[in-house]
Amino acid sequence: MNFAHSEVATLDPNTMRTLCEEYVANNYIDPETSERLGVKRGLRNPDGTGVLAGLTNVCDVVGYKKDQEGHVIPTPGKLIYRGVNINEIVDEAYRNDRFVFEEVIWLLLFGSLPNREQLDDFCEILAEHRALPEGFMDTMNAPSPNIMNKLQRCVLGLYSYDEHAEDLSLENILSQSINLIASMPTMMVNAYQMKRRYYDKQSMFFHLPKPGQSTAEHILSTYRPDQKFTHEEAKLLDMCLLVHADHGGGNCSTFTARVLSSSGTDTYSAIAAAIGALKGPKHGGANLMVYRQLKDILKHVENPEDDDEVREYLRRILRKQAGDGSGLIYGMGHAVYTISDPREVILKQRARHLAYDKGFEEEYNMLCSIERLAPGIFAEEKGSTKPVCANVDLFSGLIYNMLGISEDIYTPLFAIARVPGWCAHRVEEVVFANRIIRPAYKYLGVRQKYKPIEER
């Protein structure tokens, strides 16, 4: 018998139809049962706020406050890294015209703002560890049509090159974290080049890391064929990395990293799992969906400056009569933020000049219209008074497109930015939590008596 296949073997459609019918006939959970039993689906309270599942010093996400009766009071959003409001970091970046993502990495990992000497030394360490281990290209040689899946495989592959992969000491986990933060941009670009060659039948090229470059500069330099980019482009990418670096312990991918870390597993397994969580369209994959929806709206709206026409098309999207049929306006709404998402506010402000300079004003203005019109449409269509604000995904896809970045690495860029946060939370979980995360599930199945196979 030959077990070799060029592709994953698929089961016969008729067989699968029968198996699915068998599953549906024997499995159902009524959503009302969850409410009756007080189950917090999605680890959410009835008012949409998250269930308190842990403590952290790494990051605070502020989108509301509660009054004495426990009612949610919407507030302008704030994102706090280790006690520092990210708006202060952004202001510093533009006031003194410097890259700040590396400073944020230090801040998230260690809890303090680095002085000049510490920052310079740390940037040098990152630069020295951007290159992949000798022989690692063998791992890269098996391409994937999805770069997120390839990133997972690459991260897991590093385990084989680490003599201390299972060492859970603080020193070793921090060392592994810094290595991952430094090398993942190189993995991403190389994985993209392999995908271009194998799946897209296009030329691929590999550029060696240049010393002295920031992470944003390194990405643009190794991604672009001619290695050329403007300072403004690199600064805008630096902003994208900064605002995506962490978002508290409860978001899906970070909580995934914490769950795996609580089991005592290795760093590579924990971060690979977080990448898998981020890939999902309900989490990190949303930035790609936003940009695809933007192109669809511009294709079907004759006059982008006509609010009534835009409003009507957005209404059709919500009714599942247009777009991808999901009924979602991507880039709108957030689990925590109510009035505003500070990350979206930053990217919207910083992207405007480049959008007009590069001829993307129509796309930029349409996103502004969506942000302005969508909340009212939500209220009309859903009958809800809950405030809805734009989220970070609304402008990030447009920014990547303005930078000439392929849709293939929109979400991988999110992963590159979020690795420092994942690692900071992993360290915190391993060092301080010291207990495996193990929530309860209530069994709803009906008791069956085992029957011999002859009696079935």
Which positions does each model-derived feature cover?
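Non-transmembrane, aqueous-exposed alpha-helical and coiled segments at domain scale
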Residues: 1-456
